[in-house]
Regions:
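C-terminal segment of N-terminal export signals and the immediately downstream linker at the start
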Residues: 110, 143-181, 194-195, 202
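Soluble catalytic domains of enzymes that build or remodel membrane lipids, polysaccharides, and related
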Residues: 170-422
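A short, flexible N-terminal coil/short beta segment enriched in small residues
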Residues: 127, 133-137, 141-167, 265-283
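Non-catalytic terminal accessory segments
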Residues: 1-156, 422
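Short, charge-rich amphipathic segments
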Residues: 28-38, 126-139, 163-172, 200-212, ...
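Amphipathic, alpha-helical segments enriched in basic
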Residues: 3, 7, 54-57, 61, ...
Length: 422
């Protein structure tokens, strides 16, 4: 999305947020009205307005200075995240107040209908709002408020290890027990804590897998974003190699370039960075992984996604691959698997993807698995199988736009391939 789109969307959000302020302010007045200290009441009420309006003004000022050549910086993402946090908190607070006010409306209407001939001249139609309603509103709104703040300060670097064993009837015997570490969606332009990123890399290194793969979106927009972290991500090594592909953000499509030549040079620089990192970038091509005299094919395509750039050419990538070979495909967007790969004439045993981030927000427990991204992507995180073809969608290593994660934590995937009996 370009600068104009960001400005329109977030100015609308900011305007609605400001309109909510008067309602929340009114609710807070009810909450503090019995306090003996007038000074403390003023601190709470005007402190709220100062924070709410201040964050909105800072964000709008940041958007107005947003560079079309760089896109959103960590500062812009922080301001956006604070604005979203306050916006959702105010909505939750206002909804609780609204429920109480609707009750007041019905009570007032009923009281008027029954006692209209007995009403005093200056008797108010609405009964006064009870302090209890404001107290409930504060308690309920505190849940998302503290949750989002946790996601911004800690959750976005709270790396989780997801280990899965995948079974295949036709896995070559030599690859029985073969391990793969996958990370995806690094989005290096959003990072703001090198030490925290290093902890994630150390966790990935500690797995000592046979193969390492990265499934796209090294940067948000421009090749220079990864440069401060080259020394860190180059630490990821594996005995059978490190392989990578491009994601939709790697092409630089979301910021302005002075010329096509400049944009092309940026992409070439990004490809060079993959080489410097020690990653073999697969651009609609394949390689053979050999172990114990047996082989499997690792295939990588450029980005192909529903509603996104569709540069990936699976037919080209499959050229030279033995039709009977065991095949693993790296494809950034899981919609490629949904629309093309699972129906492909030649069986591709396993596809590894990312892209969705799991929306960076959701719930994953033993009995409940939900994220708003499920309404956009059928396969938004984890494992899926259909027609004997398996898919794994990584939840992402980094974050984008919202500078945080809540419930859907950054992921490092370790897959163990096992041969199952026919």
């Amino acid at each position: 999305m370009h600068r104009g789109g960001f400005i329109r969307i977030f100015l609308i959000i900011a305007s609605i947020s400001l309109l909510l302020d008067w309602y929340v302010f009114n609710g807070l007045q009810t909450f503090v009205k019995d306090w003996k200290s007038i000074r403390l009441r003023r601190i709470v009420l005007w402190g709220y307005l100062l924070i709410s309006v201040g964050v909105t003004v800072l964000f709008v000022a940041g958007v107005s200075s947003l560079s079309t050549a760089k896109g959103m910086t960590p500062y812009h993402e922080w301001m956006l995240s604070l604005l979203i946090t306050l916006f959702i908190t105010k909505i939750i607070f206002s909804l609780v107040l609204l429920i109480g006010d609707i009750g007041r409306l019905f009570y007032g209407a009923g009281n008027y209908a029954v006692n209209r001939n007995k009403r005093k001249p200056n008797e108010p139609f609405f009964p006064a709002r009870r302090k209890f309603i404001s107290e409930v509103a504060i308690l309920v709104a505190a849940v998302p408020f503290t949750g989002f703040l946790y996601g911004m300060f800690k959750g976005k670097y709270d790396y989780k290890l997801h280990k899965h064993t995948l079974y295949f009837e036709d896995l070559p015997d030599a690859f029985d027990g073969f391990t793969i570490t996958q990370i995806s969606d690094i989005h290096s332009g959003s990072f703001d804590n090198r030490d925290a990123v290093q902890r994630g890399i150390d966790l990935a290194k500690a797995q000592k897998s046979d193969l390492f793969v990265f499934t796209g979106d090294l940067v948000n927009n421009a090749a220079w974003e990864i440069e401060p972290y080259m020394d860190m991500f180059s630490q990821l090594k594996a005995p059978y190699g490190q392989f990578s592909i491009l994601g939709n953000h790697d092409y630089g499509d979301y910021i302005h370039w002075d010329s096509d030549a400049e944009k092309k040079a940026n992409l070439e620089k990004l490809k060079e960075h993959h080489r410097t990192l020690g990653y073999r970038l697969l651009l609609d091509e394949n390689v053979v992984i050999e172990k114990g005299g047996q082989k499997m094919s690792l295939i990588g395509v450029q980005n192909w996604g529903r509603g996104f750039v569709q540069k990936g050419d699976l037919d080209k990538a499959m050229k030279g691959v033995d039709k009977d070979a065991f095949k693993i495909l790296l494809s950034h967007d899981p919609t490629h698997w949904e629309e093309k790969v699972r129906y492909y004439p030649e069986k591709i045993h396993l596809t590894l993807s990312g892209h969705t981030h799991g929306a960076q927000f959701g719930v994953e427990t033993a009995g409940l698995r939900w994220s708003p991204v499920k309404y956009v992507y059928l396969d938004w995180a984890g494992w899926m199988e259909q027609y004997g073809r398996q898919l794994y969608v990584n939840r992402g290593f980094g974050f984008l736009a919202f500078s945080g994660r809540l419930g859907i934590w950054p992921e490092i995937t370790v897959l163990t391939l096992k041969k199952s009996k026919v």
